[in-house]
């Protein structure tokens, strides 16, 4: 678990958030059972490093003037263009009590699908699970390397450890494989050109 030092933030306004970011800081909030919402700011570089280690659904140990808390990352808001972190929401966790969180899906072998002139259509980028904080995985792998057009993958096809309970419907479609529409369209155009040429020659 990554340890981060944060400073309390007094105001929650759009202006104060912009000021915070101009200083190279990211505004955030901690909430949970038995505590009042705690507004804070943290260095952008330190936060980016922590997210690269834990992922965007992992655990963070937060140290502040109020003491230390173990927290779960609930939401990371990013700028849609620059991808810089704009805000982060954290939830206090108690000991090893089970919690629900979303775990990212890592699609393994997608490059082999592309070699088949096919595309992988991803319906989900994460799966909701329930487990103790210490057992939260950084991500789960779904091997799609042997897939062919027409194949579908369900949540049930993803492997989880026995210590993890899947909250989402196991029959939900995670991804499917289909032919590349651009290639199909080009083939149709080529065929029509060939047919028109044959008609003119006849």
Swiss-Prot record:
GO terms for cellular component: cytosolic large ribosomal subunit. The keyword RNA-binding applies. Keywords: Ribonucleoprotein, Ribosomal protein, RNA-binding, rRNA-binding. GO terms for molecular function: 5S rRNA binding; structural constituent of ribosome. InterPro entries: Rbsml_bL25/Gln-tRNA_synth_N (IPR020056), Ribosomal_bL25/Gln-tRNA_synth (IPR011035), Ribosomal_bL25_b-dom (IPR020057), Ribosomal_bL25_C (IPR037121), Ribosomal_bL25_long (IPR001021), Ribosomal_L25_dom (IPR029751), Ribosomal_uL5_bac-type (IPR020930). GO terms for biological process: translation. Gene3D superfamilies: Ribosomal protein L25, beta domain (2.170.120.20), Ribosomal Protein L25, Chain P (2.40.240.10). It comes from the Bacteria. This is one of the proteins that binds to the 5S RNA in the ribosome where it forms part of the central protuberance. Part of the 50S ribosomal subunit; part of the 5S rRNA/L5/L18/L25 subcomplex. Contacts the 5S rRNA. Binds to the 5S rRNA independently of L5 and L18. PANTHER family: RIBOSOMAL PROTEIN L25/GLN-TRNA SYNTHETASE, ANTI-CODON-BINDING DOMAIN-CONTAINING PROTEIN, RIBOSOMAL PROTEIN L25_GLN-TRNA SYNTHETASE, ANTI-CODON-BINDING DOMAIN-CONTAINING PROTEIN. Belongs to the bacterial ribosomal protein bL25 family. CTC subfamily. This is Large ribosomal subunit protein bL25. It comes from Clostridium perfringens (strain ATCC 13124 / DSM 756 / JCM 1290 / NCIMB 6125 / NCTC 8237 / Type A). The lineage of its organism: Bacteria, Bacillati, Bacillota, Clostridia, Eubacteriales. The gene is rplY.
